Amino acid sequence: MVRENGVPEVLLVHRPQYDDWSFPKGKAHEGESDEDCARREVGEETGLECVLGVRLPPVFYESRGRPKRVSYWLMEPRGGEFTPHREVDRIEWLDLDEAGERLSYDHDRDLLAAVTELL
């Protein structure tokens, strides 16, 4: 999440394998904390180094018949640069309304609503 000119924007990633738009996320390595996983996954997917802010409500959904729980934080980018790769070929900073239209999944729109309430 970043504020440009007072307008909150969120970062979305496009995953070509699924042709979807979502928030950066991923799986924790064994013994890795949720916080370290969040920083690592955002870095791997976007190339950005971020500082964690407020922890958001967990998101629960089903993927390929298995339940998923994902932890998210508001984050502030501090550096880095995106380079397209196999997992994520595009990123976009969008205002909250644009992000709601672009997101591919209802559970991500629910998370966006929680973010909107915090701002």
Regions found by a protein language model. Name each.
Residues 1-23:
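N-terminal strand-loop-strand
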Residues 26-114:
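Unchanged
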Residues 116-119:
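Charge-dense polyanion-binding interfaces
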